[in-house]
Regions:
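Extreme N-terminal starter segment of soluble prokaryotic enzymes
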Residues: 2-6
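P-loop/Walker-type NTP enzyme "switch/lid" segment
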Residues: 9-15, 30-80, 86, 176
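Hydrophobic positions on the alpha1 helix immediately C-terminal to the Walker A/P-loop
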Residues: 19-20
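Gly/Ala-rich phosphate-binding loop of Rossmann-like dinucleotide-binding domains
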Residues: 25, 29-30, 96
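Inter-motif core of Ras-like GTPase G domains
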Residues: 91-110
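Conserved C-terminal guanine-recognition region of P-loop GTPase G domains, centered on the G4
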Residues: 118-128
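Beta-strand-loop-alpha "switch" segments that mediate conformational coupling across diverse proteins
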Residues: 140-182
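Inter-lobe coupling/hinge region of RecA-like P-loop helicase motors
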Residues: 169-201
């Protein structure tokens, strides 16, 4: 598998951004991938989440830092996971430019959905990203009228959805110490995150093979297990 750089971004805070970044990095470690975790969010929660790895069997496969440099493109790690700050500043823009995939977690509310148009347009025009490189992860969508409106906005905008993750009581929504995996998630709770990891890997492979249609890139299909 080629190196994959994933940035997790939304200009709106409190949408599950760091939780997704933490669990993606941990899944990669469990699958024996070398992981570089880059914490660009001043809150430092992404860094704090991995404190338990210092004395674990994963320590030889993992390192963390709080800066992003051009030389990271040549880093030996298999997965680079970047937790962006909740603002479209120069730090986030550099991460968006650097990443292969920009995962955008969204809740069924106006504030997490409103930046999508500007973000997509800027990423496409300024950094040459394709729509396929900016998948959404839906969090907490249900049968409510607000979720229906949010789904309509997503469909009308043509935004690809990588995964739809319900909120489970076993997963803290806002984490201060993100020891998610060590808490022992139930299999049902882990599944959507494992699906997201697999779909990202598959999407990157498809784009590398020249697939350009956004629906084909993110369609269900064979991928890394």
């Amino acid at each position: 598998m080629s190196k994959i750089a994933v940035a997790v971004f939304n200009r709106k805070g409190g949408v599950g951004k760091t939780t997704i970044a933490v669990i993606l990095a941990q899944i990669a470690l469990v699958r024996h991938q070398r992981v570089l975790a880059i914490d660009l969010d001043p809150s430092g929660n992404f860094t704090s989440a991995f404190g338990f790895l210092k004395n674990s069997s994963f320590k030889d496969f993992f390192r963390t830092k709080n800066t992003l440099e051009d030389s990271d493109a040549d880093a030996p790690e298999d997965w680079i996971v970047i937790d962006c700050p909740p603002s479209l500043d120069e730090v986030s823009l550099h991460a968006i430019d650097f990443a292969d995939i920009i995962v955008v977690p969204v809740r069924p509310d106006y504030f997490s959905l409103s930046p999508l148009g500007m973000l997509t347009s800027m990423a496409e025009k300024k950094y040459g990203k394709s729509r396929s490189q900016l998948p959404l992860v839906k969090l907490g969508f249900d049968s409510s009228s607000m979720s229906k409106v949010a789904n309509q906005i997503i469909n009308d905008g043509g935004y690809p959805v990588a995964e739809d993750i319900g909120l489970h009581k076993s997963i803290p929504y806002n984490i201060t110490t993100g020891r998610i995996w060590s808490m022992g998630l139930a299999a049902r709770s882990r599944t959507p995150y494992e699906n997201l990891y697999r779909k990202i890997s598959t999407a990157v492979e498809r784009m590398s093979d020249g697939v350009t249609d956004v629906h084909e890139v993110w369609a269900e299909g064979s991928g890394e297990e």
